């Protein structure tokens, strides 16, 4: 059979399952892919293929994740499922797999459990835009009133973490929907879930539609032409003769892009994902350095003080062997550069041990271009000891 061409007509979206251990996340993931394989002819992955997820390394942190894909009437979904709780925590904090929407799986016989809450808190902190709840194993609860009570508890929990009270809740049994002889009644919950995902999750803003930003990696002088900076465009589009700002480390400076090159060819414009060289008007080589960014004027500002949520690598992952305390001074790695800074721990936290996840307040010796959601690594002697993202900007 000839290979099928990737269909770009449907909107692409990243989703994932979250929730307490053994509440049925992987079973639900398998039920969705099975349903879609039958309906749309997608490739099928069986439950055990999803559950023994391969290890991935994201900046030296080992994370087990399984990437699935399926399509609905409206979208093409890339879906991540993590087998272990620690994998979820690492995945969400390090932003290894960004989610445009999450499916929170709650077992009806067990209701809300500690990891249900922890995953919701993380989803809120790392900016997962919206959540749909799948209330699983409802066939194991005889009393419909009990199911209603669980639903109420789920809604209260959602609002306590800042998600809307009218978040959709789909009830069903992933296990029943997954069975060989599943009836239309058994799979109705999966059909309803997909329809709700299509309607309730909003289309993600594509990187190319966001304001232009390029982290500077290298700087060259071209005799008779001026200064060229190189890097990969993180977001947005840059056109010839557009004004940009050089942000971070030094005072912000305006300039104009007078040339765009990729693979030694001249372009009229560069877009998110392109590795480009940009010629800057009236800028000397010594005025620019690695670690600064080029950005659309006014779209990003330099900051030194921020809150972040981080995961601290365990000793086995190559992290520290001992805890650290408030006042710890490591290197913070943002985009393309290391900058020295101080880590302060929140009130009530005396120290942070390898393997922990925690909130910190970071303060840098130089300002860098920063916005909420920016990924960071904390390094010591050239090795990564923690990883996470900026959750709030202080100054």
Curated annotation (Swiss-Prot):
Mg(2+) binds at residue 26. Keywords: Cytoplasm, Elongation factor, GTP-binding, Hydrolase, Magnesium, Metal-binding, Nucleotide-binding, Protein biosynthesis. It is found in: Cytoplasm. Residues 81-84 are annotated as: G3. One of its GO terms (molecular function) is GTP binding. Residues 173-175 are annotated as: G5. Signal peptide: none annotated. Residues 10-205 form the tr-type G domain. Residues 60-64 are annotated as: G2. It is an enzyme of class 3 (hydrolase). It catalyses: GTP + H2O = GDP + phosphate + H(+). Its EC number is 3.6.5.3. Its main location: cytoplasm. Residues 136-139 are annotated as: G4. Pfam families: GTP_EFTU (PF00009), GTP_EFTU_D2 (PF03144), GTP_EFTU_D3 (PF03143). GTP binds at residues 19-26, 81-85, 136-139. SUPFAM superfamilies: EF-Tu/eEF-1alpha/eIF2-gamma C-terminal domain (SSF50465), P-loop containing nucleoside triphosphate hydrolases (SSF52540), Translation proteins (SSF50447). Residues 19-26 are annotated as: G1. GO terms for cellular component: cytoplasm. HAMAP family: EF_Tu_B. Monomer. Belongs to the TRAFAC class translation factor GTPase superfamily. Classic translation factor GTPase family. EF-Tu/EF-1A subfamily. GTP hydrolase that promotes the GTP-dependent binding of aminoacyl-tRNA to the A-site of ribosomes during protein biosynthesis. This is Elongation factor Tu. The lineage of its organism: Bacteria, Pseudomonadati, Spirochaetota, Spirochaetia, Spirochaetales. The gene is tuf.
């Amino acid at each position: 059979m000839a290979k099928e061409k990737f269909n770009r007509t449907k909107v692409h979206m990243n989703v994932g399952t979250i929730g307490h251990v053994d509440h049925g996340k992987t079973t639900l993931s398998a039920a969705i892919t099975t349903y879609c394989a039958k309906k749309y002819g997608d490739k099928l992955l069986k439950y055990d293929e999803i559950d023994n997820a391969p290890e991935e390394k994201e900046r030296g942190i080992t994370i087990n994740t399984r990437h699935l894909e399926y399509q609905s009437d409206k979208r093409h979904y890339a879906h991540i499922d993590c087998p272990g709780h620690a994998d979820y925590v690492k995945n969400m904090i390090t932003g290894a797999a960004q989610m445009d929407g999450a499916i929170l799986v709650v077992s009806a016989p067990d209701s809300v459990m500690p990891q249900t809450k922890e995953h919701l808190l993380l989803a809120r902190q790392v900016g997962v835009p919206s959540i749909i709840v799948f209330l699983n194993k409802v066939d194991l609860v005889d009393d419909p009133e009990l199911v209603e009570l669980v639903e109420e508890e789920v809604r209260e929990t959602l609002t306590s973490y800042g998600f809307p009270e009218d978040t959709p809740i789909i009830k069903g049994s992933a296990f029943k929907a997954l069975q060989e002889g599943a009836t239309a009644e058994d799979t109705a919950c999966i059909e309803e879930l997909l329809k709700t995902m299509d309607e309730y999750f909003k289309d993600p803003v594509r990187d190319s539609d966001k304001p232009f930003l390029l982290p500077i990696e290298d700087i060259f002088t071209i005799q008779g032409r001026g200064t060229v900076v190189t890097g990969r465009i993180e977001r947005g589009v840059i056109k010839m003769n557009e004004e940009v700002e050089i942000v971070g480390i030094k005072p912000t400076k305006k300039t104009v892009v007078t040339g765009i090159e990729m693979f030694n060819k001249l372009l009229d414009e560069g877009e998110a994902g392109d590795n480009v060289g940009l010629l800057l008007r009236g800028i000397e080589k010594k005025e620019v350095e690695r670690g600064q960014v080029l950005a659309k004027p006014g779209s990003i500002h330099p900051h030194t003080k921020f809150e972040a949520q981080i995961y601290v690598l365990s000793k086995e992952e190559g992290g520290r062997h001992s805890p650290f305390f408030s006042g710890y001074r490591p290197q913070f790695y943002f985009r393309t550069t290391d900058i020295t800074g101080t880590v302060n721990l929140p009130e009530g936290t005396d120290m942070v041990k390898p393997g922990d996840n925690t909130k910190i307040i970071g303060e840098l010796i130089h300002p860098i271009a920063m916005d909420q959601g920016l990924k960071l690594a904390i390094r010591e002697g050239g090795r990564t000891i923690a990883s996470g993202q900026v959750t709030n900007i202080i100054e």
